Amino acid sequence: MNIVFLDSTAIPKHIPIPRPSFPHNWVEYEYTSVEQTIERAKDADIIITSKVILSREVLQQLPKLKLIAITATGTNNVDLDAAKELGVAVKNVTGYSATTVPEHVLGMIFALKHSLAGWQRDQITGKWTESKQFCYFDYPITDVKGSTLGVFGKGCLGTEVGRLAELLGMNVLYAEHRNATTCREGYTPFEEVLKQADILTLHCVLTETTKNLINQETLSLCKKGAYLINTGRGPLIDEQTVCDALKSGQLGGAALDVLVKEPPEKNNPLIELAKTMPNLIITPHIAWASDSAVTTLTKKVTQNIEDFVQQLNQK
């Protein structure tokens, strides 16, 4: 059984994927471009990948392929319809980051509310050493307790964020779907959440309905100075509109772990703005990546492969 891992650097080097127990030939590459995919995977029975694009055109040229094992939850890099037509199974992994993503969100909440990035940036330039007083007050500090958190997406991650936030004394509102005709128990109408929330955190699935969920219209409904957190999917926000809202003060700050294009272009407006705006925090899509989460992920990837091969051998 030939197994090809096309983008091994999507997993930290100190936590390798356990090798399957059945006889196999394992080949891995740190990165694989679109142009390299077919040549590298032409003899593969199993492909392991996180983000390498496997289009219909590519899959049609991989006649030996039986399984695509995704080292993530999202499968948008694979043409699922083509895979099904060609008899190629696709297995992803869910639930591995149910602790680390909510913790990352809480860290972002504290960082924004206490202006931690601004204070740290000042120490790099030596500002405190030049102060006439034992402290100075250049950035706002507001309490997390008593703040209202608007959660968009009430799956396992959004629910856990809400649970932890309530333990901190925050008022948590779960947003109903935009344009919903009725409001379910345990939810608050979409526009009301925008109006009431001091902090917005995005955990919804990316669909045509949720794409650009945070746009000029929705931001205009928010409290002036509200904070935005996105650890969901980059396209949930309109990036230029968020930049404009930060510059105008409509948003008091933002903490983003995901962008529309990853890795981003050097001239990405948010990346450029973060160089000069201390209340804009960007992390490189690592909210999921605690050691325990990655360990769970790698074990589940191997288990997916083991289960598939076992089923294959039983046919």
Predicted regions and their residues:
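N-terminal glycine-/charge-rich "phosphate-binding" loop or analogous flexible N-terminal tail
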Residues: 1-44
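Phosphate-binding beta-alpha-beta segment of Rossmann-like dinucleotide-binding domains, i.e.
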Residues: 86, 94-148
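N-terminal Rossmann-fold NAD(P) dinucleotide-binding loop
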Residues: 158-159
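Rossmann-like dinucleotide-binding domain for NAD(H)/NADP(H)
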Residues: 231-315
